[in-house]
Amino acid sequence: MAYDMVIKGAKAVTPDGVIEADIVVQNGVIAEIGSDIEASGTEIIQADGKYVFPGVIDCHVHFNEPGREDWEGFETGSQMMAAGGCTTYFDMPLNCIPSTVTAEHLLAKAELGRQKSAVDFALWGGLVPGHIEDIRPMAEAGAIGFKAFLSKSGTDEFRSVDERTLLKGMAEIAAAGKILALHAESDAITSYLQMVLANKGKVDADAYAASRPEEAEVEAVYRTIQYAKVTGCPVHFVHISTAKAVRLIREAKQEGLDVSVETCPHYVLFSHDDLRQRGSVAKCAPPLRSRQSKETLIETLIAGDIDMVSSDHSPCRPSLKREDNMFLSWGGISGGQFTLLGMLELALEHQIPFETIAEWTAAAPAKRFGLQKKGRLEAGCDADFVLVSMEPYTVTRESMFAKHKKSIYEGHTFPCSISATYSKGRCVYNDGEKVTEIDGALVVPS
């Protein structure tokens, strides 16, 4: 039988393990996976023993469009994600102007994505003071969930929530059948410590890290779990950086609460030492932790207590990455291209099965957010997959697809590389070359 595409000789990373297989694609969907399939195709791809992973589903990126396209934007951002093996990303509601806090804003943003994105995408709505009544209309317009900050967001347009807004908003999100994504750092702790340190003239990397201690994350997670008990709101804790907070989330799961947690590659690949040595390219919130805390977080991840890994790609204009005052420097790491590669580096260092990496980067987010046709190499799923070569790759400015090249990953050598990425059977990245065809669609739970 003739098909649109047949990938021959792949090491397919399936939920049941890695298998030697051919992958057959028809009409943008995986038609069959198996050994020595007798099928012809319009396009035959010889995988030559490369690993084939399900396309990454990154639940946490900031593309800043509309309004701050000079920071990133859908066009360069989606091409960057494709270069990293990502076939679906969730764009956050802040750093764009206007923030995505009404159904009108969400629908307008979705149309921009359709016009410019190389791969599929979802959109977070925002939970901010004064917009609780907009939650249900945004849910009906296609929001994948709602994002809130307990500490300052970094932009004036997207305000952090007070306790009443958080509680009422969580009740409304629960009623709408959606999920709250929470930036869990205590504003009381972080603002107070920053004031104390800045008043003493301490504004370097050590001062910044000291102003956002693990206790700020733990307090915010604990408080939100209590609100989840009261409201019944499902919660997804984003970019958790400390095992102490993960333990609270694990206990909440054991009590039957509907909670999940992500961490980011930079929290398991880098440490506070990198912020000291590299400066503002390593600034993020929560901050990179000590080497010991990093190792403990890795142990927690390997133990299965963290559901998924997302990039929290948060770029800016290079001029905003100041070195003279770490408090005033933009806090975000540009790294959306390196999630899968970073986790594969971790896998090889710690003997983590590749199917576990596929779970963290694809299957778990698909399951959590109801994307039933994504996240797995299985017949009937979207033909979203990435070919990985076990050839080392050193990140250069020329090989970065993000709009701006100021990144902690510059100069980093990964033990493997992305050879090609396919979204619904279309090649969207091939061996260092971006593919400019636009076919990204807004995805919603199915």
Curated annotation (Swiss-Prot):
Q: What is its EC number?
A: 3.5.2.5
The induction annotation reads: Expression is very low in excess nitrogen (glutamate plus ammonia) and is induced during limiting-nitrogen conditions (glutamate). Expression is further induced when allantoin or allantoate are added during limiting-nitrogen conditions.
Q: Name one GO biological process term.
A: allantoin catabolic process
| Maturation and modification | Carboxylation allows a single lysine to coordinate two zinc ions.
Where does it sit, as one GO cellular component term? Answer: cytoplasm
**By its UniProt entry, which Gene3D superfamilies does this protein fall under?**
Metal-dependent hydrolases, Urease, subunit C, domain 1
Q: In which pathway does it act?
A: Nitrogen metabolism; (S)-allantoin degradation; allantoate from (S)-allantoin: step 1/1
List residues, modification N6-carboxylysine. Answer: K147
Q: Which residues bind Zn(2+) 2?
A: K147, H183, H239
Task: Give the matching SUPFAM superfamilies.
Answer: Composite domain of metallo-dependent hydrolases, Metallo-dependent hydrolases
Q: Write out the catalysed reaction.
A: (S)-allantoin + H2O = allantoate + H(+)
Which GO terms label this protein's molecular function in UniProt? Answer: allantoinase activity; cobalt ion binding; zinc ion binding
UniProt keyword terms in alphabetical order: Hydrolase, Metal-binding, Purine metabolism, Zinc
Q: What does the note accompanying the cofactor annotation read?
A: Binds 2 Zn(2+) ions per subunit.
Kindly list the positions annotated as binding Zn(2+) 1.
H60, H62, K147, D312
- Name what cofactor the protein needs: Zn(2+)
Whom does it interact with, and what assembly results?
Answer: Homotetramer.
Give the protein's biological function: Catalyzes the conversion of allantoin (5-ureidohydantoin) to allantoic acid by hydrolytic cleavage of the five-member hydantoin ring.
Q: What family does the entry list? A: Belongs to the metallo-dependent hydrolases superfamily. Allantoinase family.
Q: What is this protein called?
A: Allantoinase
Q: Read off the lineage from the record.
A: Bacteria, Bacillati, Bacillota, Bacilli, Bacillales
Gene name, per UniProt, is: allB
